[in-house]
């Protein structure tokens, strides 16, 4: 019996090693292949004075991006595409109020592949992609192949192979591919970026990021809408499937993939999967399709990333549990810590005018002088307009403002294709780690060792 158990243990251990080594070999294969294009880390294209944009997906996120884009100077909407006719016509009617230049807008709906027809017929400069997760990679790849820059909702892709395909296509076509991580444009995130750049909290050591947002109500969206497809991801996958809202900002605080440091490995663990099944059991008939699913994804996932410099980043995801919203947004250095939800600061020796030591947080009105001195220049310039326009407190508008500004002036984007893939890679890597009882997973280096020559993100004036 002892020998039998030992054989089973060896067999299971070997399977885990094989699975991990297979992923590693796949990553090394891509790493060792020379790129057929040019590195895109600091890429800038020639200025586009009048940006002709098409939109794919007009359900949840698309309408907000459409409004923010269309209200900016130098923009023209040339096509709208969605599975559903009412979404397309509703946004077309709204568009007339936003942008008088967009008079000849082509409308597409009804067929799963209408977006491909749209790309061929309209030939836009840029395409905004706001669809279900599985469509992100094929849509951004085809967009670039058809000659347009791609701007995609999060996550950028759901497998590392898709991410390599995106990187290779971007390098080959010399087209931007930006995953639109809007949280990087939040007021507090911009403030913290500025504080980190100015060395206020010393050498950066540790970060904590999250997307904890109870979204069980989306299961009401059963035939169309986010819940109609996202619920199946909860059932079929187990890991951190939505890492970038919390991770994007702290990665840029740390200059991850931008000349200073890079993610190295991740370990991941999930709790039991209980909340979705209990919610379905309570709210739907026994034979309802949500009660026929076996929910695989744990209610809460916790992942821990190790960087090349030895820093640590904790990333959590929970869209199921009854608890308040948070993204953590914590960055810790040798002389202080910045944290979110609520916004608070602790500095060695205290925050001037607020606290006497690092043993208590400065928060609320006590942070007024810190905002006054260290407010990010971009928020000083556009923040009031962004808050008026709305979209998650103005962060959505600021993101679109910067996209348009960079394209019109021929500047590098604030988020490059490698960052979008790296941040999204926590998804499939965490799934692999959870499946292997927390075994470390190596991050692919989508830059092929060129990250250490990439410039840090500027503090944009």
Task: State the predicted function of each range.
Residues 10, 66, 92, 116-119, ...:
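Non-transmembrane alpha-helical segments in soluble domains
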Residues 12-16, 30-41, 64, 322-461:
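C-terminal helical cap and adjacent loop that interface with cofactors, partners, or active-site loops
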Residues 57, 172-178, 183-295, 328, ...:
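Predominantly a Rossmann-like dinucleotide-binding segment in NAD(P)-dependent oxidoreductases
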Residues 147-159:
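ADP-ribose/adenylate-binding Rossmann-like module
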Residues 292-295, 301-305:
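Short N-terminal edge-element motif at the start of the domain
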Residues 303-309, 333:
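Active-site beta-strand termini and strand-to-loop segments that position acidic
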């Amino acid at each position: 019996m002892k020998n039998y158990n030992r054989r089973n243990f060896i067999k299971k251990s070997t399977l885990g090693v094989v699975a991990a080594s297979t992923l590693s070999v796949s990553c090394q294969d891509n790493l060792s292949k020379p790129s057929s294009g040019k590195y895109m880390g600091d890429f800038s294209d020639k200025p586009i004075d009048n940006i002709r944009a098409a939109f794919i997906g007009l359900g949840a996120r698309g309408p907000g991006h459409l409004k923010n884009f269309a209200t900016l100077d130098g923009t023209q909407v040339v096509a709208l595409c969605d599975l559903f006719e009412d979404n397309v016509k509703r946004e077309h009617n709204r568009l007339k109020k936003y942008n008088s230049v967009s008079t000849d807008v082509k409308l597409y709906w009804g067929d799963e592949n209408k977006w491909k027809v749209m790309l061929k017929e309209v030939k836009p400069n840029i395409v905004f992609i706001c669809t279900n997760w599985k469509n992100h990679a094929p849509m951004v790849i085809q967009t670039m192949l058809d000659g347009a820059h791609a701007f995609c909702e999060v996550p950028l892709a759901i497998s590392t192979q898709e991410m390599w395909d995106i990187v290779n296509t971007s390098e080959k076509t010399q087209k931007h591919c930006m995953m639109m991580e809007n949280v990087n444009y939040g007021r507090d995130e911009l403030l913290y970026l500025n504080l980190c750049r100015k060395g206020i909290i010393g050498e950066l050591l540790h970060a904590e990021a999250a997307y904890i947002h109870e979204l069980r109500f989306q299961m009401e969206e059963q035939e169309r809408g986010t819940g109609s497809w996202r619920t199946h991801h909860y059932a079929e996958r187990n890991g951190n499937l939505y890492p970038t809202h919390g991770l994007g900002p702290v990665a840029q605080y740390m200059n991850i993939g931008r000349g200073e440091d890079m993610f190295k490995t991740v370990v991941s663990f999930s709790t039991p999967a209980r909340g979705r099944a209990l919610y379905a059991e309570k709210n739907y008939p026994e034979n309802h399709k949500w009660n026929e699913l076996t929910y695989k994804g744990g209610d809460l996932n916790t992942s821990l990333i190790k960087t090349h410099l030895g820093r640590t980043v904790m990333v959590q995801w929970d869209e199921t549990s009854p608890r308040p919203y948070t993204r953590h947004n914590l960055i810790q250095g040798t002389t202080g810590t910045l944290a979110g939800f609520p916004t608070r600061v602790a500095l060695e020796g205290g925050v001037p005018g607020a606290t006497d030591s690092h043993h208590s947080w400065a928060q609320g009105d006590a942070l007024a002088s810190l905002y006054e001195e260290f407010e990010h220049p971009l928020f000083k310039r556009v923040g009031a307009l962004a808050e008026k326009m709305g979209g998650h407190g103005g962060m959505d508008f600021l993101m679109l403002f910067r996209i348009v500004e960079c394209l019109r002036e021929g500047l590098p984007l604030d988020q490059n294709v490698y960052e979008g893939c790296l941040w999204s890679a926590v998804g499939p890597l965490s799934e692999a780690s959870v499946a292997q009882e927390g075994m470390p997973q190596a991050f692919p280096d989508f830059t092929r060792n060129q990250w250490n020559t990439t410039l840090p993100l500027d503090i944009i004036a």
